[in-house]
A protein has these predicted regions:
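Extended catalytic-interface subdomain
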Residues: 210, 222-240
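Conserved functional hotspot residues or short segments at active or partner-binding sites
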Residues: 234-235, 239-417
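Active-site rim segments in enzyme catalytic domains, especially the processed small/beta chain
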Residues: 218, 224-225, 229, 245, ...
Length: 417
């Protein structure tokens, strides 16, 4: 973990822990829970780890001082084009706002004028973090979100007017897995005409729930209100009372209906029409946030064969073995990310290894045409995974974003203005 306790004492990615406090944990029958129990402990205490490192003949010993492990929620921060910054938020947690502001300051120092805010696959998190980030883009007293329920008084969350990015253009990237707190930020920016939303309709998760403890130690979450965007749209997608299966199958229904691949398949009743608050553009309710610019899911690029390779763990496991075997050479050949990005090409041996493993697990493409469609994205994914292992998550996204239609559309619109 970057900047974690282990990294501070010299433990590297790819090292293998073989014993903890002189007790062997490798090559013995020990449950994962027991291993974690030995590794964990009170903050400030120490643990002695025996490490095996490729190329080093003897076990290496490190004494690690237990500490809080930093878990980042901002996945990537970089200049995607001159004057255009890019920030990807993976979820909204306790440190998200702080990380976001650090990223904004970095990008401003590098000349950012406009921002691409990537909320794809962001499942939500803390409401307060979402409100704080939306506040950075909106003038004083602009409504960010409100909650309302049958027996709960309406509560408004408004911008304080002290945001640090009140004039630059904002482009918000979303998809069908953008949910909850991420939808709050998206809805606020769209309703106030503060930016352009790009991608596909978001998930539609906007419930305010109260936990109630039961005598047997279990707990239920009682829905007491819903979240609404500034224009009055309910974020929560509709559900029929008692029909859990229908609610759970929403993604499959969207895919079957063609909503993810063709905007023309999406129809809204007049009752679901709302209007943005500054420019009075038409936006739609009915659950989730409908983007201003639709980008279809590329079903040609994401083949069934590729999905099987990923689901079976073949891609990630083959990448880890490749990194473990070649780390020293890779670090020497590519001392900087710029060198890696411009010169590294996925070797054929890595592709061959994946195909060999796929054959072992009886996974194969339908035909050569599917294989050829799979290879470009597979190679991009492998290069991104190698970048992540050699550098960090931000470098992973700098590679993988080159194949993302939603990111490319964001860059196109921001560059064209």
């Amino acid at each position: 973990m970057s900047k974690g306790p282990s990294e501070k004492v010299g433990i590297m990615a790819g090292d293998r822990i073989v014993n903890v406090n002189d007790t062997a944990i490798a090559g013995v029958k020990m449950k994962k829970e027991e291993i974690m129990k030995r590794l964990r402990g009170p903050r400030g205490t120490t643990v002695k780890l025996g490490i095996v490192r490729r190329g080093v003949p003897d076990v290496m010993y490190f004494t690690v001082k237990r500490d809080k492990i930093p878990v980042k929620s901002v996945d990537a921060v970089y200049m995607i084009r001159p004057q255009i910054g890019y920030i990807r938020i993976g979820n909204f947690g306790a440190t998200t706002y702080k990380e976001f502001m650090e990223g904004m300051e970095k990008l401003k120092a590098e000349g950012m004028k406009d921002l691409i805010l990537d909320l794809q696959d962001n499942g939500g998190g803390y409401l307060q973090a979402a409100v704080e980030i939306a506040n950075e883009f909106l003038p004083k007293d602009d409504l960010i979100v409100y909650t309302d329920g049958r027996r709960i008084r309406r509560m408004d969350y408004k911008a304080r007017g002290n945001g640090s990015f009140l004039t630059g253009r904002v482009y918000v990237l979303v998809n069908e897995f953008t949910a909850s707190a991420a939808e709050i930020v998206t809805g606020a920016i769209q309703d106030h005409d503060r930016g352009i939303v790009i991608g596909r309709r978001t998930f539609g998760k906007g419930l305010v729930q109260r936990p109630i403890d039961l005598p047997d130690g279990s707990m239920i979450r009682l829905t007491i209100a819903h979240y609404y965007t500034p224009s009055g749209r309910c974020i929560q997608k509709p559900y029929t009372k008692g029909d859990i299966e229908d609610y759970a199958m929403d993604f499959e229904k969207r895919l079957k209906h063609g909503e993810l691949t063709n905007r023309d398949s999406i129809h809204f009743a007049d009752s679901l029409k709302f209007y943005t608050l500054k420019e009075h553009r038409t936006v739609y309710g009915g659950g989730g946030i409908m983007p201003d610019t639709f980008v279809p899911l590329d079903t040609l690029q994401y083949t069934k064969f590729h999905r099987q390779l990923v689901l079976k763990g073949i891609v990630i496991n083959t990448d880890l073995r490749y990194i473990d075997k070649n780390r020293k050479q890779l670090v020497g050949d590519y001392p900087t990310f710029e060198a890696f990005r411009s010169r590294f090409e996925v070797p054929q041996e890595l592709i061959d290894e994946i195909m060999k493993e796929a054959e072992k697990q009886k996974i194969k493409p339908k035909d050569d045409e599917e294989l050829q469609r799979t290879l470009p994205y597979l190679k991009s994914q492998l290069k991104a995974l190698v970048a992540r292992d050699l550098f960090d998550m931000s470098e992973y996204f700098q590679i993988i974003n080159e194949t993302s239609d939603i990111v490319k559309k964001g860059v196109e619109l921001s560059a064209g203005k």
